[in-house]
UniProtKB/Swiss-Prot annotation:
Annotated source species: Mycobacterium tuberculosis (strain ATCC 25618 / H37Rv)
Ranges of biased composition (kind: Basic residues): 293-306
Protein name per Swiss-Prot or TrEMBL: GDSL-like esterase Rv1075c
Residue numbers spanned by region Disordered: 276-314
Functional pH dependence: Optimum pH is 9.0 (with pNP-acetate as substrate).
Temperature profile: Optimum temperature is 45 degrees Celsius (with pNP-acetate as substrate).
Similarity comment: Belongs to the 'GDSL' lipolytic enzyme family.
Protein role: Esterase that preferentially hydrolyzes short-chain fatty acids, particularly pNP-acetate (C2) and pNP-butyrate (C4). Also has weak activity with pNP-hexanoate (C6) and pNP-octanoate (C8). It can also hydrolyze short-chain tryglycerides such as triacetin and tributyrin. Important for intracellular survival.
N-terminal signal peptide: 1-21
Active site: residue positions: S80 (nucleophile), D244 (proton donor), H247 (proton acceptor)
One GO CC term on file: plasma membrane
Activity control mechanisms: Esterase activity is significantly inhibited by the serine modifier phenylmethylsulfonyl fluoride (PMSF). Completely inhibited by diethyl pyrocarbonate.
Protein keywords: Hydrolase, Serine esterase, Signal
Record's catalysed reaction(s): an acetyl ester + H2O = an aliphatic alcohol + acetate + H(+); a butanoate ester + H2O = an aliphatic alcohol + butanoate + H(+); triacetin + H2O = diacetylglycerol + acetate + H(+); 1,2,3-tributanoylglycerol + H2O = dibutanoylglycerol + butanoate + H(+)
Length: 314
């Protein structure tokens, strides 16, 4: 999600450029942007991170060094949602949940590397991928979560999707399995007033559709997070949003991570011919207490032990 709502200022400018008939709408949207900035805080705090090697059994993460072996290298690219901004613990971060899930169900040693940066747009993701290729070899698997900041920056829908496709294609050309969580639905953020929220929703849906087509064409696997999770955000906002009412909460991240994990697991196991060992509860899977249904409020989240880095010596 973007660090601050700039949707109205950009959108108002776009509307104003189409003619004086939109002057009233422009003034309204600018006013709403001013209000949104007073209730949506900037993202100053660094999200928790626990990069390293994960193994079956839910034990503490092992800090990776050159002498530490691993079977599958997983990289996370994208914006604040990819970093897990708003999470209180590393065990709530999407990358950690996905890495633990892969370790549990494949029995492989999963190395997690997070390249995502808070506030990134599709342009930023291209930079993340560029930097990765400079530093070292590409991963075996990549997860990208991107789109919201392209909406707030009023980046073009087509160019944003094409930049994402270029990143996916580069990773796929080097043998990586790529799963993309497409643009979230900004229309669920009640801190953004109407009609600004409706405009954000419309552009977000358009971008998600364009991303889906572009990612498929580039050989990646798109996961429509906005479409799949928006109903839950609308039904349970007090549970799905973090304290800033803007970024996802730990249960929301868990749902997103589960969707991405399933897509990545299927694609990765097909590529590497890895047998799957189903577990009763995947790391990060939201579980319901008796009396709750799948569509009612989730009461708790089953989590493994905290991801504490273990020195490997040397």
């Amino acid at each position: 999600m973007p660090r601050r709502s700039t949707i109205a200022l950009a959108t108002a400018g776009a509307l104003a450029s189409t003619g004086t008939a939109y002057l009233g709408a422009r003034n309204l949207l600018v006013g709403q942007a001013t209000h949104a900035r007073t209730v949506i805080p900037k993202s100053f705090d660094a999200p928790p991170r626990a990069d390293g090697v994960y193994t079956r059994g839910g034990g503490p993460v092992q800090r990776w060094r050159r002498e530490v072996p691993f079977d599958v290298h997983l990289m996370i690219f994208g914006d604040s949602t990819a970093t897990g901004y708003g999470c209180a613990s590393a065990e709530e971060v999407p990358g950690v949940l996905i890495a633990r899930g892969l370790a549990e169900q494949t029995g492989k040693r999963i190395r997690l590397s997070t390249k995502a940066i808070v506030g990134a747009t599709s342009k930023g993701v291209c930079g993340q991928v560029d930097a990765m290729f400079v530093v070292g070899p590409p991963p075996d698997a990549a997860v990208i979560m991107i789109g919201a900041n392209d909406i707030t920056a009023l980046n073009g829908i087509g160019p944003s999707a094409q930049r994402l496709a270029d990143c996916v294609r580069r990773l796929r050309t080097r043998g990586a399995v790529v799963v993309v969580g497409t643009c979230p639905d900004l229309g669920v953020i009640t801190a953004i007033p109407q009609p600004l929220r409706a405009l954000a929703h419309t552009r977000g849906v358009r971008l998600a559709r364009a991303q889906t087509a572009a990612v498929k064409a580039a050989g990646g696997v798109p996961v429509p997070l906005g479409h799949l999770l928006a109903p839950k955000f609308r039904a349970m906002p007090e549970l799905m949003f973090s304290a800033d009412r803007y970024h996802p909460s730990a249960p929301a991240y868990a749902l997103a991570a589960d969707l991405l994990f399933l897509a990545l697991r299927d694609a990765l196991t097909e590529k590497l011919d890895i047998p799957i060992h189903e577990t009763p509860s995947r790391p990060g899977t939201a579980t319901l207490e008796p009396g709750h249904t799948r569509h009612s409020m989730m009461s708790r989240l089953r989590r493994p032990r905290p991801a504490r880095a273990v020195p490997t010596g040397g």
